[in-house]
A protein has these predicted regions:
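Contiguous, often N-terminal, cationic amphipathic patches that form binding interfaces
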Residues: 1-53, 62-64, 68-74, 78-94
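C-terminal catalytic core of tyrosine-transesterase DNA break-rejoin enzymes
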Residues: 59
Length: 94
C-alpha cells in the first residue's frame, strides 16, 4: 500500500505505527505509509493492541468485532481491516 489506508469495497485496510504506554490515546500524524496511533495501555501480552482495537472501534463507529488484526499483535507495526466503517476520522477524509 502506498498510503496508510486502502479501501477494499466497503472495508478499510489501515496500516498503523503504534505507540504503547503514551500519556494520551489519540490518532497522530501520517508517517510514510502508516498512521501513528498512541494508546495509554502498556505493551504487554497484547494489551496495547486490545486497547487500540477498542479506540479504533470508537473512532470508526463500529463494534470491536468488526476490526480484524491482520498482523502485528506484539509489534508496533500493525495492519487492521475495519469492516464497513460508519465514520471516518478527519485524517482519512482529507
Amino acid at each position: 500500500m502506498d498510503k496508510f489506508y486502502q479501501w477494499e469495497g466497503d472495508d478499510l485496510r489501515l496500516n498503523i505505527l503504534g505507540t504503547p504506554g503514551a500519556k494520551q490515546t489519540k490518532i497522530g500524524k501520517v508517517r510514510g505509509n502508516q498512521l501513528k496511533v498512541s494508546v495509554s495501555c502498556a505493551a504487554e501480552k497484547g494489551k496495547a493492541t486490545a486497547c487500540m482495537i477498542k479506540f479504533l472501534a470508537e473512532q470508526f463507529k463500529v463494534k470491536e468485532s468488526d476490526i480484524t488484526l491482520v498482523f502485528g499483535l506484539t509489534s508496533i507495526n500493525k495492519q487492521f481491516l475495519i469492516e464497513t466503517p460508519k465514520r471516518l476520522p478527519d485524517i482519512i477524509k482529507s
